[in-house]
Amino acid sequence: MTRYAAPGTEGAIVSYQSRYDHFIGGEYVPPARGQYFENPSPVNGLPFTEIARGTADDVERALDAAHEAAPGWGRTSVTERSDILLKIADRMEANLERLAVAESWENGKPVRETLAADIPLAIDHFRYFAGAVRAQEGSLGEIDDDTVAYHFHEPLGVVAQIIPWNFPILMATWKLAPALAAGNAVVLKPAEQTPASIHYWLSLVADLLPPGVLNVVNGFGVEAGKPLASSPRVAKVAFTGETTTGRLIMQYASENIKPVTLELGGKSPNIFFEDVWARDDDFRDKALEGFTMFALNQGEVCTCPSRALVQRGVYAEFMEAAVARTELIKPGHPLDTDTMIGAQASNDQLEKILSYLDIGRQEGAKVLTGGERIEHDGELKGGYYVQPTIFEGHNRMRIFQEEIFGPVVSVTSFDDFDDAVKTANDTLYGLGAGVWTRDMNTAYRAGRAIQAGRVWTNCYHAYPAHAAFGGYKQSGIGRENHKMMLEHYQQTKNILCSYSPKKLGFF
């Protein structure tokens, strides 16, 4: 066990600044209106830094810097851009522990996750797109003996990126790595709940990028996010967050006919067929671990498997074991490497989760375990902690249909394959799903039948850089990750060239 010291205390490997301004044009600049807001740690509910409160004036200044930098960055050779991304990855790897502690303190998640997943994945995403852009090629089409169609990949120019609070550094990386690799300049707005860890990351890597290529404007959605998303000066808007906000982002961008990538909410089903229980072996144990994935990152994941569907013939035995497995999840100090579940990211999110715990009870759902806030004493007093909770009910309940974004799973049974698929698809969302079975025919058929952008099969919560990610239905538009993302941040230029000296013959 390792217990990291809180940032800024004796023995700490991380120190946050007392104040962070906007990062514009390669330097920190104060907010145009001189306003700041406090940023509390979910670990104890206490402010640890203050953040510049951005407005439209700050957004315009950032766009000025981005537009000045974009042409030069777009003309920079692919080799040089790739090398810079690799240097960013190397710098992050050299400071992995510091980044992990910084993010855990600001977001509340267990440091075991940031050490093993969040930061290593972010590093790998930069390396992946550094390689992908080197391998990308245009195309040539021979129309006839004298006519050739050339196709070139050109950057969009200046793009807007709005980042969520559940994975501050990783979600920024998902957007930044392909955008920068493709030759774009970026204006990024972090979530108002978690802006500081982005600035800590910037303190490590900002010197590697030309001034103006990456600009960060802090602030709240209406004050900074709206003017950024609605600006005619951006060529694309990429957003990750809840569906209601995504709908607004789409409206803002549509006013200027700008493309959007939206990674939105989910209510992902995790389906356990009865053959999972056929033998008491490693696979059964793996499936039980798969059930508990609803508590990963405190359930603050868009693809959280927040609905579990268990085949009726094994339901009682499976759920007895699943409840026991869930109760082994260890809460505690987020900076302790033994802690398995930390704090919710904000007090607002804590209150939302607690309200859904009440809703579930009012609907008649049965609490199989959990269902309460965790009240810690000592240095965790005032933090935002919730017990992993299992509800038993039916798919028409609000707790089955609405995104809670907390460590809460709603469980029901199904009769057969068709019943499982019908229940899985009975939702407005379609971001992720899980299928657990020993029969690969069942696995394949279920994966194709479920209306979701990603279907994990005998696994869950894996996010490799080279696997496309995105939603069906109201879970979003577009994809993230995979080399296809380069083209999402590019436009295709066609030069149709005739080498014939003869006349066209029209007139």
From Swiss-Prot:
Its EC number is 1.2.1.3. SUPFAM superfamilies: ALDH-like. Pfam families: Aldedh. It catalyses: an aldehyde + NAD(+) + H2O = a carboxylate + NADH + 2 H(+). NAD(+) binds at residues 219-225. The active site is at 263, 302. InterPro entries: Ald_DH/histidinol_DH, Ald_DH_C, Ald_DH_CS_CYS, Ald_DH_CS_GLU, Ald_DH_N, Aldehyde_DH_dom. Keywords: NAD, Oxidoreductase. Disulfide bonds: none annotated. The keyword NAD applies. One of its GO terms (molecular function) is aldehyde dehydrogenase (NAD+) activity. Gene3D superfamilies: Aldehyde Dehydrogenase, Chain A, domain 1, Aldehyde Dehydrogenase, Chain A, domain 2. PROSITE patterns: ALDEHYDE_DEHYDR_CYS, ALDEHYDE_DEHYDR_GLU. It comes from the Bacteria. Belongs to the aldehyde dehydrogenase family. This is Probable aldehyde dehydrogenase. It comes from Streptomyces coelicolor (strain ATCC BAA-471 / A3(2) / M145).
